[in-house]
């Protein structure tokens, strides 16, 4: 993968993260929580309507998670723009370390909470970032050999 393509893919993944986080925050602010109610219900199959996003605790956790996603997306975008663009090895290392740390802790805790499906949902999200980094790293290594 060309470096410019990897940069565009990482910017896209960052913006997608920001949008997903903003959707969670807006759901809390507006009270339009139905899409997230379905999402949480899907975490604990079968789809039976038992999970919700209605209590104060659930709403504040959604707000916190959304804010963290927005913050991570902004940070990933800045790392991509100011570090990865000029130093793909360093920028890729920073992003990869953060993403793998998130993936392992989030997935392990989700599994422990009985929401094993979240591990499956986390995986494509992780790959949105890791695939461009890895393919660019592989291309750079092949060009330098």
Residue ranges of each PLM-predicted region?
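Transmembrane alpha-helical segments in integral membrane proteins
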Residues: 64-83
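Short juxtamembrane and helix-loop transition motifs at transmembrane-helix boundaries
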Residues: 27, 53-59, 77-90
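Cytosolic juxtamembrane helix and N-cap/initiation of the first transmembrane helix
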Residues: 1-27
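Alpha-helical transmembrane segments and their membrane-interface exit regions
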Residues: 43-44, 124-136
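Membrane-helix boundary connector in multi-pass membrane proteins
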Residues: 104-121
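Membrane-helix boundary elements
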Residues: 19-60
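Short, charged juxtamembrane terminal tails flanking transmembrane helices
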Residues: 1-3, 137-145
